[in-house]
Amino acid sequence: RSGSVVSPRSAPRRISCDAKDINLPVLLSAATFEFAFIAFDLQTDHRFSAVDTAIHDLVLASTSDQLREDVAAQVLSNLFPIGGFGALTLSTLFLLFGLTPSVKTRLGVAWGVYISSMAAVGVLKEAFARPRPSADILHSFAFPSGHTCAANVLTGLTLFVLLDPVWDAAKKLVGKNKAEYKSSQDELGRADVKTQDLQVAARPPILGMRISFWIFASCTTATGRIEGNRHWLSDTMGGAALGIIFVCLALMLIQQFEDAFVSDGID
């Protein structure tokens, strides 16, 4: 139909949080340096131990056993790792319908990065074999914090990798339903315009909001691990840095794929 306001084909939209929005090489370098610094300190004279011990003693002196166990260890520690895994899973299920090469790539990279990050945490824990602050936990080691890394990776993947395709799919679904409803009462042209207006008006959360929530998720989880007497401060710093590394690698990898899709004209 001539005069349609919806273009028949559009180039795949680049990932919203690429190197133009976040300086990924700088962020990756900073996170790598932080992790390497903490790891080196643990393997040498561990000068950061004074800070770790001071924070640990402060937590024990200012909180009760019940607060540490019921609130910090159970709620704060698990809120974002469990919530992030749920968000990643639900996003994947939602996107399974009408998969495009770009969406397939994002899903594959997201799950691959998450699994790889958890495998890396397991290997690093065994390699560093750092005792936990609580003498009651002897079955696993402390560095790096797996919960903090998981919260960082899962939240980052959901916000920066899958949120945009989920948002686009939801817009199309709502727009289609609205168009069908309008077309049953009005002429098709007006329904088409309404659908386009809806898709233009709807915008996903801005980058600043995503970054703020990403930081909040990591800090909340780290606080839970420290106050729950599960980890030293440096454990959570290492876990957060490791999570940032994996999220940055995921974004950079996806960007390379989507650049190739654009150049090849693949939707």
Segments and roles (model prediction):
Residues 135-267:
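Membrane-embedded catalytic cores of phosphoryl/pyrophosphoryl-handling enzymes
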